[in-house]
Amino acid sequence: MSRRRVVITGIGPITCVGHGREDFWNGILAEKSGINKIVSFDPSAFRVRCAGEIRDWDPEVFFPPHRLKRLDRYAQFAVASAKLALDDAQFEYSREKPQHRVGVSFGTALGGVCKAEDQYIRYLKKGARGVQPTLAVQVFGGSAHSNIAIEFGFRGVGTTNSNSCASGTVSVGEALRYIRDDFADVIVAGGAEAPLTTITVGAFDIIKTMSRWSGDPALACRPFDLLRDGFVIGEGATSLIIEELEHARARKARIYAEVLGYSLNNDAFHMTAPLPSGDSCIRAMRDALADAQLAPGEIDYINAHASSTQLNDGAETMSIKQVFGKDAQRIPVSGTKGYYAHPLGATGAIEAALCTLALDRQWIPPTINYQNPDPACDLDVVPNHGRKAQLNYIMSNSFGFGGINACVILGRVR
């Protein structure tokens, strides 16, 4: 029995380098970082000074005022990105005519932490009477996927995962499984995060995982660079319309790429450090290749997790060499977080969108801010400038806190 084939028909990024498909892609082509100084709160109590902050966000473009009272910032990003993706896919929706074969698979690491901190401050100042009565339904992690389903009338599969930095990739991979196994025909898959709060930045600063770069903020995130000193936190969301191939063809949808393979596993080792042997990362890539029914040498480009930490980038390089052998030196491997920072649970979805566009446009995005080669990261990291290439198959890695490893493989539709 042949497997149901699964494709991507809509893309809706909201990041610090652009909102919507073309704005985002133009930001990538510009080869400049969207990272800047934090302005949403005073970071002077911390050694962290910069983030991938979305300064031009205007929620009233997407929502009437009464809706905003019930949406945390991360849920605003989620619902807005879903609308961008649905419109890009030219997919018809209506709350008055709900659809039972259309679902939502979304990811977030921290959910409504922004609203939680805001309301806790209100509680300290005014007591319980100062707290919004809708607080409970704004802060829980599932509020993003629930609000997407409510907004657009999708009554099919509904799920939220909170797999740290791998959440967005997991949401895409699980959408593949739901559709392949005939639980749905269409899934809105993605991730959203709005973690720029004192409690979140402070917590990561304490454990010394974030960059303490004090120079030009645009240079703070330096994947694979010898002098990288930690990840840069960001915010945003991306939704992808994941659809069964014949369903997409029947409605004459534009098809960007096919979702071919997915894997998910755990290091079972440490909350912040990767498994020294790289065994689980290696298995994740090999399992995704097996699911996609591809040989390692067929991959044309790898979008690495490459969070700009000393441990992660080196460990990922070692794992790629183990999986791809002699092909590891030939296959371009870029880390793209220098553009949009690391929006935690949204990152994997952002990178899935970037890989989808790379396939569609036949162009490999670079590792920007690469200045000092690291002998431990001796791959073709596509330094500073992108390049045209013949791309048929792309792998995207997400290796998150807690040792959660996810990998998806995309390809051109044949």
Task: Label every PLM stretch briefly.
Residues 1-67, 246-258, 353-367, 411-414:
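ACP-dependent fatty acid/polyketide chain-elongation machinery
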Residues 5-9, 36, 215-292, 300-301:
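Condensing-enzyme catalytic core mediating Claisen C-C bond formation in acyl metabolism
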Residues 8, 23-24, 32-163, 192-201, ...:
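Conserved beta-ketoacyl condensing-enzyme motif
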Residues 10, 28, 82, 104, ...:
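Conserved small-residue
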Residues 39, 183-229, 262-276, 306-313, ...:
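Acyl-CoA/ACP chain-elongation machinery
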Residues 78-91, 141-145, 149-152, 157-193, ...:
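Active-site-proximal alpha-helical scaffold in enzymes
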Residues 125-132, 170-173, 177, 194-250, ...:
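Glycine-/small-residue-rich "gating" segment that lines the acyl/pantetheine channel
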